[in-house]
């Protein structure tokens, strides 16, 4: 059976769109510190905290965090928890000074950042964030009931990333199969 040129073109477009969609699901996110305002600077008030802002976001392994600041006047230091808590700028794990720093979050667990400018960390220019493990599901299981008669019920197992990715391959297979059919 021969395909007309327009049907073949339509099938190709569907296949390409499907591939783009699948790759977008696996793409890493870039998150700018501070959200839309995007400025790495001393917070405007003592009630604002970069860490509280970060707690509203979900960071996963492979994401990037972007710091925007005036090069030459400020910097970003990646530090240990102890250095973060004491605003100690000596011996950072990493020192960034380019004005638009993009840090890859390459592991799960906590990350700590402080300003390298004198006195800025003490005025609140610091950020701690937690990167979730690839094992964690984006969807949290429902809470268990408070009272039990026969014993506690098990929470449903979280859906792993490999199961979600496997579902994407099924969709891709269906689309490609439909393309071959027409």
Curated annotation (Swiss-Prot):
Effect of deleting the gene: No visible phenotype. Plants lacking ENODL11, ENODL12, ENODL13, ENODL14 and ENODL15 have a reduced seed set due to aborted ovules as a result of pollen tubes failling to rupture and release their sperm cell cargo.
Listed GO MF terms: electron transfer activity
InterPro entries: Cupredoxin, ENL_dom, Phytocyanin-like, Phytocyanin_dom
Location(s) in or outside the cell: Cell membrane
UniProt function note: May act as a carbohydrate transporter. Required, together with ENODL11, ENODL12, ENODL13, ENODL14 and ENODL15, for male-female communication and pollen tube reception and burst at the synergid cell surface of the female gametophyte.
Major location category of this protein: membrane
GO cellular component labels: plasma membrane; plasmodesma; secretory vesicle; side of membrane; vacuole
Covalent lipid sites (GPI-anchor amidated serine): 160
Protein name per UniProt: Early nodulin-like protein 14
Domain of life: Eukaryota
Tissues showing expression: Mostly expressed in seedlings and flowers, and, to a lower extent, in roots, stems and seeds, but barely in leaves.
Pfam families cross-referenced by the UniProt entry: Cu_bind_like
Positions of the pro-segment in this chain: 161-182
Positions annotated as glycosylated: 88, 95
Disulfide bond residue pairs: 87-121
Gene3D superfamilies, per database record: Cupredoxins - blue copper proteins
């Amino acid at each position: 059976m021969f395909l007309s040129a327009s049907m073949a073109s339509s099938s190709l477009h569907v296949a390409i769109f499907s591939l783009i969609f699948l790759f977008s699901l696996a793409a890493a996110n870039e998150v700018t510190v501070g959200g839309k305002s995007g400025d790495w600077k001393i917070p405007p008030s003592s009630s604002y905290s970069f860490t509280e802002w970060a707690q509203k976001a979900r960071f996963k392994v492979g994401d990037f965090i972007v710091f925007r600041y005036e090069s030459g006047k400020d910097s970003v230091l990646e530090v240990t928890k102890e250095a973060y808590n004491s605003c100690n700028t000596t011996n950072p794990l990493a020192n960034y000074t380019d004005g638009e720093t993009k840090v890859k979050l390459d592991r799960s667990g906590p990350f700590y950042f402080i300003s390298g400018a004198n006195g800025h960390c003490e005025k609140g220019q610091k950020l701690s964030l937690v990167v979730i493990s690839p094992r964690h599901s984006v969807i949290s299981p429902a809470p268990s009931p408070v009272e039990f008669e026969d014993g506690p019920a098990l929470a449903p197992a979280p859906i792993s990333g490999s199961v979600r990715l496997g579902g994407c391959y099924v969709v891709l297979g269906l689309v490609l199969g439909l393309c071959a059919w027409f």
